[in-house]
Amino acid sequence: MYSGGYEAQLYGADSNRGDSVLEDTPEGSMDGMKLVEPAAPEGQENYEAFADAYENEHGERPTAWSAFTYDCVVTAALSIEAADEFTGAALGDVVRDVTRPEGEEVFTYEEAHAILADGGSADDIDYQGVSGPIDFDENGDPRGSLVVIEVQDHDYVSTEFREA
């Protein structure tokens, strides 16, 4: 396309981003390409604590996927603790409850565990993930934040942050 003189607006997702993409294309050929990828809520206090601990352990900042995975594990652990029994049906009944806005906002597993240990139920908890609030939609999917990235001068530049 580029070498033939055809100009088109290119769009992609996180799988289209990588150093090799730019290294393997002529300078300027990708300029203007826009990508949308999941984003962690940088600046959010519990995310920053998570990111600092991650960086201390691994020597680099975490990806958004690291934050999502962490929240998945915490949400699963809280569901297991809050459920009446360890079955798929029982866990499915409480997984949304431990993240509902009607509960008390908690930012760590330890805070949520304390509520359950004091006789509270899943309904009493609103776990706020390191990846942002975890409010499941009608399909059971968590809402998330996105970053819009544009290739400028043959480099990736974050141009916009959108909370879902």
Regions found by a protein language model. Name each.
Residues M1-A164:
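Extracytosolic ligand-binding ectodomains
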